[in-house]
Amino acid sequence: MGEMIEGAAAGVPFVAVPPVDPGAPAALVAGWHLMDAPAGERAMAEAVPMAGLQAWRVYFGLPLSGARLPEGGYDEVFRRASEDAVLNVFQPVTEQAAGEFPAALAELRDRLPGATGPLGVFGGSAGALVALEVLARGDAEITAAAVASPVVQLAPVIAANERRFGVTYSWTERSRAVAARYDYVDRAAELTAPLLLVAGADDDIAVREPAEALRAKLGTELVTVDGMAHEFPPGTPGAAGVDTAFSEWFARRLRA
């Protein structure tokens, strides 16, 4: 993998890795990490390097993560999530990350040498939710997208967290409206670019079943990674499976 460039674009922290041939025109592939491992922009770059692409790979930091952790750090994020995961974490993270993407993209097009080619977006888990929202909004011309361990429907993920942490989430009219918005099976018609779905064979049904439903509705590709649950930390077989799937997908779909 080429040398990482670290910085901020329109206030959004990122790491970027240059294409195989830095002197030739390149595609731009931009995405967002998980809140689970890999839980940061550098970790995501190490887990899913997509090293063979003639593309700049840009890994954005999510709000409420890394350099943008609130005072109190991850303990404060967990406190907010335990208070209301939908309204305090998923909604603000997704809305901010999707909203800041167009300006960050425009700055990166200017700053990264040769990054004039087609655009791909990607993400994992909560970062996949951002990628799907960016794709649905249509604020940028996206040629292809890929998501791993994707939050395709928010409501089942909240139910999975209830099982995982032994808690009960108190739904309100407002949080139900947010969950309805973050239901990309229902909003499949808004996902107009070719989309690859990647899921771990051992992930929760809250991820696997909505991913399969979206695959069926779009008629798109779903890759299942054997032995992978939800996370795919750098250096694991799961990460290698996601990286292979993403790399092959974008190599087919993006031509600088």
Task: List each language-model region with its residue ranges.
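Short, surface-exposed "cap/lid" segments of acyl-processing enzymes
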Residues: A10-E76
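Short beta-to-alpha linker loops that shape the active-site pocket of alpha/beta-hydrolase fold enzymes
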Residues: G61-S65, V151, M228
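Short, flexible, mixed-charge acidic loops at enzyme active sites
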Residues: R68-E83, A160-R164
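Alpha/beta-hydrolase active-site loop
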Residues: V77-R111
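Short, surface-exposed alpha-helical segments at coil->helix boundaries
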Residues: F101, R208-E212, A240
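Primarily recognizes the serine-hydrolase "nucleophile elbow" in alpha/beta-hydrolase
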Residues: P102-R164
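The feature captures the conserved acid-bearing segment of alpha/beta-hydrolase catalytic domains
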Residues: A155-K217
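C-terminal catalytic histidine-bearing segment of alpha/beta-hydrolase fold enzymes
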Residues: G219-A256
